[in-house]
Amino acid sequence: MKRSKELITKNHSQEETSILRCWKCRKCIASSGCFMEYLENQVIKDKDDSVDAQNICHVWHMNVEALPEWISCLIQKAQWTVGKLNCPFCGARLGGFNFVSTPKCSCGQLAAVHLSKSRTDYQPTQAGRLMRPSVKYLSHPRVQSGCDKEALLTGGGSENRNHRLLNMARNNNDPGRLTEALCLEVRPTYFEMKNEKLLSKASEPKYQLFVPQLVTGRCATRAFHRKSHSLDLNISEKLTLLPTLYEIHSKTTAYSRLNETQPIDLSGLPLQSSKNSYSFQNPSSFDPSMLLQRFSVAPHETQTQRGGEFQCGLEAASVYSDHTNTNNLTFLMDLPSAGRSMPEASDQEEHLSPLDFLHSANFSLGSINQRLNKRERSKLKNLRRKQRRRERWLQKQGKYSGVGLLDHMTLNNEMSTDEDNEYAEEKDSYICAVCLDVYFNPYMCYPCHHIFCEPCLRTLAKDNPSSTPCPLCRTIISRVFFQTELNNATKTFFTKEYLKIKQSFQKSNSAKWPLPSCRKAFHLFGGFRRHAAPVTRRQFPHGAHRMDYLHFEDDSRGWWFDMDMVIIYIYSVNWVIGFIVFCFLCYFFFPF
């Protein structure tokens, strides 16, 4: 009795506590115990009274003496000055604090620490009990009374829960909040049956074999109420979410694949039965009573073998229909069959899982896609790319003759879009970093190994060809190498653009400008090397050809020999030699 009183008191305190949730990640960030004393009157006034827009308070005023831990840490980190309050889970902006010059709210109160109402969701007290059920006492069913055991077996707790959900749905018509509240009640239980059919079957002699096993102490000691599992759990633990991201433009439905030997109670559910699969579709209008009726179906079956936990493989499919609402999402659920102790499978009742409420109108696939790691996303991307190539190849072979006109047009549009995307991706690897156009006569610069097209290099080396810096790394270009294979690939894949650049290059004067080249050490008096420089072989990017080249590292020995300077010197020496010869001839032929 003492524990039951404590449990009642604890549940009563939970019912009186309301919470605030982040508008983005839907995580609990604060409770009503952190608000100021007048906040309850403020909430009632905002809901019921028709006050002017200037007098309505748009923030939640927080009590400085009862702040949440994460807010206290942020305030202490800012040394009780000024700062912003961001969500500790997703980082979204929620409010702020100001202890330097405390601003005054429109309601007349000082907003030292406040949370914005537009960035938080206030959850009323009706849904407070759905947030975190008590596990301390419910995990030990052997201390419960007989009434509790009867309610446990007959599903009385499920009816009370449905009654609470119905009240919440009537008070709050937001389908997103109701769906979230329902998600918190998903538990992997071992056995839960409807009261009427269980009691009726218990009286029949052929069910006396397995009905007493449910009320024995051995089965009652098994953990019935487990910790609530939300949809925010890790995927590898309970839910295996495999979104099929292929775009399907035809009208499709989702099928819940069940075994052929499993009879299903479909009374009151809007399902369309087929041979061994059942399709369900979300209606356009939200009906809380229908949702609760679907949720009230007993979700589990009797199990006697070890390890027969009920598991759901939830495969989220991003399927959009052309004739239905775009918010209607479909899910594919695998319900694996558990072990049975009776030879007649039709004698045991099996029902749909309560997860079928997940195809609510406001459930998005963004959180599912974020769960996928980089490896899975790359695999999906590769599969889609291979499928598109296969479809293009089949289309070229003319094997789409049996496809309808509309499907063929849709397929052509899809493949044209995919081809454009792949064309853009392939073109990025053949674009020069200077002119941002495809390569025309590409050259690789040494020693930085950056590749540029010929017009760009000649333009850069116009003023100073002997000390031209690389436009990317600013390294002095000592020599350039022509890339034959890259040039041929560019000419093959981008013929029109290549020819256009070629015509413009031939018409311009840049073809007469020199390519960049650095001075080379010419050993006149430093002595020639007996051994040749080591010959190296490098694999250039973009699939360029291999090239054997000498070691052109800078060498301090010997004199620097510049070809341009040599030409200048030769011309100047010729004039000097000619002048000397002229003077010598004048001396002999015209003596004084």
Swiss-Prot record:
The keyword NADP does not apply. The keyword Cell inner membrane does not apply. The chain crosses the membrane at residues 565-585. One of its GO terms (cellular component) is endoplasmic reticulum membrane. Its EC number is 2.3.2.27. Residues 281-489 are annotated as: Interaction with ZIC2. It is a single-pass membrane protein. Its main location: endoplasmic reticulum. InterPro entries: RNF180 (IPR033263), RNF180_C (IPR045790), Znf_C3HC4_RING-type (IPR018957), Znf_RING (IPR001841), Znf_RING/FYVE/PHD (IPR013083), Znf_RING_CS (IPR017907). Coiled coil: none annotated. Residues 1-564 are cytoplasmic. Pathway: Protein modification; protein ubiquitination. A zinc finger (RING-type) spans 432-474. This is E3 ubiquitin-protein ligase RNF180. It comes from Homo sapiens.
